[in-house]
A protein has these predicted regions:
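Pre-Walker A (Motif I) flank of P-loop NTPase domains
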Residues: 2-7, 70-71
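Conserved GTP-binding G-domain of TRAFAC-class P-loop NTPases and closely related GTPase folds
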Residues: 6-10, 15, 23, 115-165
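Conserved substrate/cofactor phosphate-moiety recognition/catalytic segment
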Residues: 19-71
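Conserved beta-strand scaffold positions in the cores of enzyme catalytic domains, especially
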Residues: 30-32, 105-107, 151-155
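Glycine-rich phosphate-binding loop used to anchor ATP phosphates in small-molecule kinases
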Residues: 51-105
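Conserved phosphate-donor/acceptor-positioning beta-strand/loop module used by diverse small-molecule
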Residues: 101-117
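Active-site flanking loop/helix segments enriched in acidic
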Residues: 168-197, 218, 222-232
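Divalent metal-dependent catalytic cores for phosphoryl transfer on phosphate-bearing substrates
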Residues: 196-306
């Protein structure tokens, strides 16, 4: 059976994703298929967002043509949704199997702090509105192996990004006076994180993840509900996704970058037990794996106990 390398870029607009795609194209001897390039080619406007259905139909078709011709290829788009990543990965694997071709799937996660994405975006010829970057940031799913990847590559365009948010202890100290303004929390944000961490002391990666599991709250804090109505309590919609992305830039000290990705994944899922309640363990053990679910539940129990 022949083997074809398929690479999917994952990153926010302005993260340096397309520049990275060119680098990996040389490394893997692969063709790059970019959603922005297709928009420019077909609609003469790389910023066009009115024909996404047509753009991605063309992109997917070209990926499959490369696979059928046994060519390595790179999918260059933001690809922020884990569900869509998984669905397309299954789709091309099924397609390749009909051609007696095996897919070696790699995910390139371009790790750039959102504030740099916004800054770099302003330097581009084709700029993405800042509110679009903000929306994508709040909906970003950090990639992980349960999606079906053979390998995930963490690509930091600037080496210093790896620990530019400092240590978990520094975040806790800086938020000891952060009033959460929510009836579910009697403690400040820093106090809550410290108390939750005490509940999982000695748990290694789980302890690290617990110490910053709510780090996305300051960014997401709003006194408006989902209808846009002003409320007396503060809401933190999507803080688990923002927090998971932020974890990639904390100093993980003795942990490797891929262990840090695991911690980010724990933060990504730590709210799910609240949403799924008694169905969480059974449903998500099949979806993301038993070990990951058990570690998420450790954070959940610590989170509840620290309210």
């Amino acid at each position: 059976m022949k083997i074809c390398t398929f690479v999917m870029m994952v990153g926010l607009p302005g993260s340096g994703k397309s520049t990275a795609a060119k680098y990996f194209a040389k490394l893997y001897e692969a063709n790059v298929h970019s959603s922005d390039d297709i928009r420019e080619e077909i609609f003469n406007n790389a910023e066009d967002q009115n024909h996404n259905k047509e753009v991605f139909e063309i992109l997917h078709k070209r990926i499959k043509e490369d696979i059928e011709n046994e060519k390595n290829c790179i999918y260059d788009a933001t690809n922020i949704s884990y569900k869509r990543r998984m669905a397309f990965l299954r789709e091309i694997r099924d397609f390749a199997a009909t051609k007696d071709i095996k897919i070696h799937a790699r995910c390139i996660f371009v790790c750039t702090p959102v504030e740099y994405c916004i800054r770099w975006n302003k330097l581009r010829d084709c700029q993405v509105p800042e509110e679009v970057i903000d929306r994508m940031y709040r909906n970003f799913d950090v990639p992980y192996y349960y999606e079906g990847w053979n390998k995930i590559v963490l690509y930091y365009p600037i080496r210093a990004f790896r620990n530019c948010y400092g240590k978990a202890d520094e975040f806790i100290l800086n938020h000891l006076d952060f009033n959460q303004n929510n009836k579910h929390h009697s403690l400040t944000l820093g106090g809550h994180l410290e108390k939750a961490r005490e509940r999982v002391c000695g748990e290694g990666l789980v302890s690290f993840a617990t110490s910053i599991h709510d780090c996305g709250k300051p960014y997401c804090a709003t006194f408006k509900n989902t209808k846009g109505e002003i409320t007396e309590v503060c809401h933190y919609y999507s803080h688990e996704k923002v927090g998971a992305y932020m974890v990639m830039f904390f100093d993980a000290e003795t942990f490797s970058e891929f262990e840090k990705l695991y911690a980010a994944t724990l933060v990504r899922w730590h709210m799910q037990p609240y949403f799924s309640k008694e169905n969480f363990e059974n449903k998500y053990s099949r979806k993301i794996g038993k070990d990951l679910v058990q570690d998420v539940l450790k954070i959940h129990r610590a989170d509840v106990a620290a309210h």
